[in-house]
């Protein structure tokens, strides 16, 4: 399986360039008329935050009288967490899972208890994992079993660098857990067979979408639900979505990077930026961008968009992210075991 390409060779160089840009931008001086914040996020949130930044800027201008500019950075969630820990001057981190926020906390940049700063464990939107297939579903892909069949090319990112990829993997693991009644020998064999069909491990979810949609690789993309919807919206004649029989409740997490906002003197706007994600206006925008709002009233308004009956497991069913990371994605973990053989 080592023959497969693992994408992302240029990530480190790109990060150096970004860090240089942010080093100039991140030195906020107090200005009663203008403020700037840096949002370091994961791959498929680009379109949402481009729109959200506009409505937040309008809100902040009306409430405080300050104009606000938001600089965005996007990439694989695990990689982004590492870059922040290594000096990328994010004011807020909006990443794919709580483990990546914890990694920044462990680097001394985020205060303890961040998960309780905002409602719903500081997860203002959720998602799940689905399959994006080519129009007409020529390989008859309906559930996780079909991804292990001979001749099926699978595209999914690398769980070493991508938070979405870890959700993908754990959704497959949840299916295997149910199918094999918790027999880990059989579960590992199933996951190994699935990853044997993976053609390329891109560094992030957007790179995986590019491989599937723009480069025409593979028969099925394991994807964030919102990313799959965007692909169908933009290419309705080319793709369709398949919801597997079991998936996982994916909970992206948000946090203020406390040490950085102290340096930049912009804690008030950074905290408000995350708090406003829970407003009705932002929750509607979240749904329009195919994330699942945590406001249940607004979620139900969009029931025609989302499959609200899909069986969703949670990461807590597997002991939480600390245990999952250690068991599956740390060096020498289950993923290394099944992928490197």
What do the PLM-derived regions correspond to, one by one?
Residues 180-244:
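Ligand-binding pocket segment of bilobal, Venus flytrap-like solute-binding proteins
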């Amino acid at each position: 399986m080592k023959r497969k390409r693992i994408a992302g060779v240029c990530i480190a160089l790109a990060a150096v360039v970004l860090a240089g840009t942010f080093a100039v931008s991140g030195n906020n001086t107090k200005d009663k008329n203008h403020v700037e914040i840096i949002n370091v996020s994961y791959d498929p949130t680009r379109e949402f935050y481009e729109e959200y930044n506009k409505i937040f800027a309008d809100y902040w201008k009306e409430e405080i009288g300050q104009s606000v500019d938001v600089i965005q950075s996007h990439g694989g969630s695990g990689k982004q967490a590492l870059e922040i820990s290594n000096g990328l001057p994010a004011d807020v981190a909006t990443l794919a899972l709580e483990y990546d926020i914890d990694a920044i906390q462990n680097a001394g940049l985020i205060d303890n208890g961040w998960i309780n700063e905002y409602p719903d464990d500081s997860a203002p939107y959720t998602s799940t994992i689905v399959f994006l297939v080519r129009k007409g579903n020529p390989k008859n892909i309906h559930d996780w079993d079909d991804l292990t069949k001979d001749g099926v090319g699978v595209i999914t990112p690398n769980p070493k660098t991508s938070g979405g990829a870890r959700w993908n993997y754990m959704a497959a693991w949840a299916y295997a857990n149910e199918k094999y009644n918790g027999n880990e020998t059989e579960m590992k064999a199933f996951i190994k067979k699935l990853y044997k069909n993976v053609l390329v491990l891109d560094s992030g979810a957007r790179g995986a979408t590019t491989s599937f949609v723009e480069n025409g690789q593979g028969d099925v993309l394991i994807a964030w639900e919102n990313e799959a919807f965007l692909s169908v919206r933009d290419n309705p004649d080319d793709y369709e979505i398949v919801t597997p029989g079991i998936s996982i409740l994916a909970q992206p997490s948000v946090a203020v990077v406390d040490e950085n906002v102290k340096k930049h003197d912009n804690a008030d706007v950074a905290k408000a930026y995350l708090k406003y994600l829970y407003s009705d206006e932002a929750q509607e925008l979240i749904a329009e961008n195919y994330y699942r709002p945590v406001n249940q009233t607004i979620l139900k308004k969009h029931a025609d968009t989302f499959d609200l009956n899909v069986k969703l497991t949670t990461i807590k069913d597997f002991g939480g992210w600390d245990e999952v990371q250690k068991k599956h994605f740390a060096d020498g973990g289950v993923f290394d075991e099944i992928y490197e053989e």
